[in-house]
Structures are given as structure tokens and as C-alpha cells.
Amino acid sequence: MSDPISFKVILVGDGATGKTTFVTRHITGEFRKQYISTIGVEIRQLPFYVAGQSCPNGREVLLNVHDTAGQEKFGGLRDGYYVDSDACLLFFDVTNRVTYKNVESWYRDVFRICPTRRDASTGEEKPLAIVLVGNKCDVKDREIRTQTVKFHRSKNIPYVEISAKDNFNYELPILSILRTLLNDPTIQFSQAPALLPADIGMDAATREQINKDLEAVNNVPLPDDD
């Protein structure tokens, strides 16, 4: 197995969109937690084990996940939270239209401070790896339907919907950023991430429809006037 490699991942988005829950439901390997009061952030180091064309014998990846610890409720985040990031998971709540409207502002803040990352293998400057994450897709009374989400297409970033209560698609945001950071679209988990048991169970038809809609919104280009 190749030597472990580590990356800094930041979680951004309005409060109560599920950022902290997303991290704490991952219980793979050793769980480390650190709080840095100067920038109001909790850091959790999560290990993932992957394999692909670039690492056929497998590789351990350590994600140092920086969580706001609720600081976004008090007038934004300090610039130090963003500095030297390799990847960003940008959250909104599909049951709250305001959190989706605020995605643009969060995206702007991130790229004002950290528009690029240093490639792990070449040392070149590359765009920050970012994934748009719509949480709480298990709720039937959604305010934001999958088909209406367009922000990711205007920025050419992936969009994933997840359910913290169901563990639905929970591995996809991490897998997406790992493929970008390791420059390898064939990357898969060689060991499935261990998650806390699901609180609910979405029916198979709902799961299938959401993933079908996600495939459509991730592959259909925006109209010229959007």
C-alpha cells in the first residue's frame, strides 16, 4: 500500500444544513478531534482507504475535515478557516430555500481566500476541489427539487444529494473530492466507510428517482440564457 497522503477539507454553508452531522456519522478508523479557538473550528481527521489506476495496491487518505463548530451563526467565518484548503463541501438544505440562495455567497467567500490548491503529485496550482451537497433529501416536503438545482452547472462542479438520517449517498461527496484530489476518476473505496446506523429507511423507488434526477442535472448543460 502506498504511503498515506493528507488533505484539508472545509465544510461551508448555512447553519443547520447538516455539516457537523455529516462528519460525525463517519466512524471509520481512529476518530481524532481538535478545536482551534483562534479561528473557531473543529478538526476531525478521518481515514479512508481507496484503490484505483493510480494506486492499484491501495492507499490510505487522511482527510483533515475542518468544521465551523457553528461559528457561521455569528456573522461569518474568519479567513483563516479557508487558508490552504484542498477541497470544500458546500452544503445546503433542500427543505429550506434560503440555504440554497446563500450558496452563491458561500462560494464567493471560499474562492476569495482559496481559489486554488497545490496538486499533490505535480505541485501545480489547480482549482479548489468542491462539491455541492444538498442534504435532507429524505424529506418529502422539499422546497428545492433536484431538477431546479443549477448552481453547480454554472460553476462546473458536481452536485450530490444525501440523507443523514438514511445514509443515502453518504459516501459520494467524499468519493468525488478524492477522485479530484488524486487525479484519478477510477478511485473507489477499498474499504467501505463505516457509518452510524441509519435512523430511517427510504424506499427503493425514491432512491432510484433521486439518483436518476441527479444524473440528469449533472450532465445536462445549462441553456445559453442561464
Swiss-Prot record:
Residues 3-184 form the Small GTPase Ran-type domain. SMART domains: RAB, RAN, RAS, RHO. Belongs to the small GTPase superfamily. Ran family. The keyword Glycosyltransferase does not apply. GO terms for molecular function: GTP binding; GTPase activity. Found in a nuclear export complex with RanGTP, exportin and pre-miRNA. Residues 70-86 are annotated as: Switch-II. It comes from the Eukaryota. GTP-binding protein involved in nucleocytoplasmic transport. Required for the import of protein into the nucleus and also for RNA export. Involved in chromatin condensation and control of cell cycle. GO terms for cellular component: cytoplasm; nucleus. This is GTP-binding nuclear protein Ran. It is found in: Nucleus. The keyword Repressor does not apply. GO terms for biological process: protein import into nucleus; ribosomal subunit export from nucleus. GTP binds at residues 14-21, 70, 135-138, 163-165. Residues 33-41 are annotated as: Switch-I. Signal peptide: none annotated. Keywords: GTP-binding, Nucleotide-binding, Nucleus, Protein transport, Transport.
